[in-house]
Amino acid sequence: MMRPPMRITAACRLLFNVVLATASVPVLAQAPPPPSPPAGTDAYTLGPDSQPQPGVPRGKVEGPLIWKSRVFPNTVREYWIYVPAQYDPSVPAAVMIFQDGHKYVNVEQEYRAPIVMDNLIHRKEMPVTIGLFVNPGHDSETFPENRFRVSNRSVEYDTPNGDYARMLIDELLPELAKRYTLTTDPERRALVGASSGGICAFTAAWERPDYFRKVVSHIGSFTNIRGGYHYPFLLRRTDKKPLRVFLQDGSNDLDNQFGNWPLANQSMAAALKFKGYDYRFEFGDGGHTHKHGGAILPDTLRWLWRDVR
C-alpha cells in the first residue's frame, strides 16, 4: 500500500533550519582565511578624513574594558569608549555602536573610526557622538590574538534574533549611561559592523527599531551561516520599518558553502529598494576585506547622519 506523502510542517522546517545552522558551526570555526582578491582589484586608499588633521581636537578612547554579559552567560568581552572633545554633559550625545570593536577603534588600520569621527564632528558633518566599540564574547578571559576568533562571535552575530539587541539595551547602554549623558532618541543611535558584524548590526535594528534606526553593514554576511539569508524575503513581506541602511560589498567577496556574499548583498539592496527604504548600496570590486569600507567610512557617516546634528 502506498503511503501518503509526508506533510512538511512549520515545525519540521524550523527543526531543519536549526539542525542546519548548528551543523555549520564547526565548519565555520575551522574556515580558512578568505582568499585575496584578484590582482588589480580592492585598490582602495584612505583619504584625508581618515588622517589626523591640524586644528581638529581629538577625542579620547578608553579601554579595553571588560564586560560579563547576563544575556550571554559565561562569556567575557572587551569594549572601548570614544568620547569626542566636543562632548558636553548637559547635552545628550548621539550613540554609535561598532561590532568587532577592536577593528574599528584601531587608528592604524582600515577604519580608524575615532579619527574619522574627530574630523566629521569638528566640521559638524555628524552630531556629537559617543562611540561604543564592542567585541563578541569569549569563553575565557584569555582572548585569542585574532579577536575575530573569539568563541561566541557566530552565536551572537549570525543568529537572526533579538538576543544581541537585548544585551545592548539592557546591559551595555545602561552601563555607558552611568558615565555619559546619552540620547534616548532612536534616530540618534546607529549600529555598525563588518561581515558577521554587519548582519548583526542589521539584526539588532530590525528587532528593535524603537532603539536603533541607523545601520552600516560592511561586507555583511547575509548568507546561511545561521539563517540570515532569509532577510531579503522578510524585508519584502514585512511592513516597512523606520530604518536607514548603508550596505557595502564587492564583486570579489566570498562564495562558499554558506552562500555568495555579493549576491546576498545585492538581494538585500534590491529588497530595500522594493520596500522604499532610505538606503544606499556601494558595490565595488573588493573581496572579503576592510579596504573599501574603510576608504568610504567618512562619506558613509556623512550620509548616515546627514539630517542629524
Regions found by a protein language model. Give the residues of each.
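N-terminal secretory signal peptides that target proteins for export/translocation
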Residues: 1-11
